Amino acid sequence: MKYMTAKYFFYSGLLMLLSAAGNASASVRDTISLDRGWQFHRGDVSDVNMLKNLQANDEVVNLPHDFLIGQDWVAPDASERPDNSDAGSNVRSRLSSRGFKEMGIGWYRYELTPKAEWKGKRILLDFQGIMLVGDVYLNGKRIGGTDYGYLGFDVDVSKLLKFGEVNEIAVKADTRNPNNSRWFTGAGLYRDVNLIVTDKDLFFPRHPLFIRTVNNQEVKIRANIFNQQKKVKAPGTFIPVEVRILDAEGHVVAQQKTDVDFNAKWRDREYELPALKIENAKLWSCDTPYLYTAEVTLYDNEGKVADQIREPFGVRTIEMNPQHGLLVNGKKVLLQGFANHHTLGALGAAAYPRAIEKRLKMMKEFGFNHVRTSHNPYSEDFLRLCDRLGILVVDELYDKWLAQYAGGRVDWESLWQKDIPEWVKRDRNHPSVVLWSLGNELQQYSNLPFNDWGVTAYELQKQLLHRYDDTRLTTVAMHPRYRNLDTDSIPADLAVATEVNSYN
């Protein structure tokens, strides 16, 4: 792409952002897409500040973007042919596990001029995923990043942005070495990036709502609220919170406004809001995936709206027992589907909602009703579409409990305590999710010191998971054997411990 063409599209994307920001300024919570107009540089740079000088020869891309799918194919040489004497042997190429594509590094750069009305606000950069590991820079300084590309994160830039100036956002995406995964992962900013603007003192933090339905009519909502209003000095201060339940046509079917007691010592805490009842609720199922929306509004000390968040949900019950298996709304349902990776074939790993929707609709036409997210969390768009189309999901977190399968930059032991809360809080309100899977083929590996075939590691993770969702059961996908069933079978300790037994 020539320089003038690249610059035209780059600044067109920037103008679209500023226009969107201006139109959204009246909202109490602005969520602005930053998906259009990123400079992309293939390869590493010694200094992040060099990127601006390289833009004349770089591409301008829109997100989601997978830079690995565009790499050349690398065929295995004669020494890398499979061992035909072993039916389970793969091609021994150094790249076979990642789709015969060269691993590498890609840099993304974006120019942002903050609007004047954002001053005094809380401003977040929200990344829904950077594959495989990523680092985020603002005006040349590292401000955040991820060691697990299948989950998102946000960075508070309220005090870092320079108003009245062009700010440079840069993102480094690193695929690491080929052994960091056993399939084609894609690379780069393969999911959406947003800018979120809220009130700075009273707001909902990340993934703040936990919505449960009881007896197919009662709706319970637990809300995480952050309050640092200066007038809050002692217990007995109340925060007005309003909840409205909207049906699929946008009509209010239940609502309630209540005051929650706030202690100044607890700036960040969860509140169990009073339950609401939906008369003659329409149930969510594979055949009738009916969705309601919970709208929760916060009011400040002066009675003005401080923040508002909307979350779709479905009214349904799920149960698993040895007698009947899975019951949805009291009816037995067989999981008929497949385990699949997050990529989209020739399109690569970029999470295009339209492509995901097409695949799910084809599944429904074939009579399928289920997807296992092998072996990592899919995009939020995927789950929204499963909710809308009536596809049941076994939501899986990891492949192996090993460093190289967890991302390659840090050990798995350093990941799970922050990954599980992000994963569960992100996905727990989706009616399509019926079972949590903590991972794939997990019995025991040398980096785990417990020597009990994965039981202690599972119990620790299960305990943390149920802190954030006690409405669903947990499982792991166990590997029943190695090469020879007669001599290499694995002890069944983990099968006894898991809430639901699952085998590959």
Language model feature labels by segment:
Residues 118-122, 161-166, 232-236, 266-268, ...:
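Short glycine/proline/serine/threonine-rich loop/turn segments at secondary-structure transition edges
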Residues 360, 370-504:
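Substrate-binding/catalytic cleft of secreted carbohydrate-active enzymes
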Residues 41-45, 98-206, 228, 246, ...:
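Accessory beta-strand-rich segments of carbohydrate-active enzymes
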Residues 1-28:
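Bacterial Sec-dependent N-terminal signal peptides
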Residues 138, 218-261, 269:
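Beta-strand-rich binding/interaction modules
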Residues 26-126, 181-189:
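Extended carbohydrate-recognition surfaces in non-catalytic/accessory domains of CAZymes
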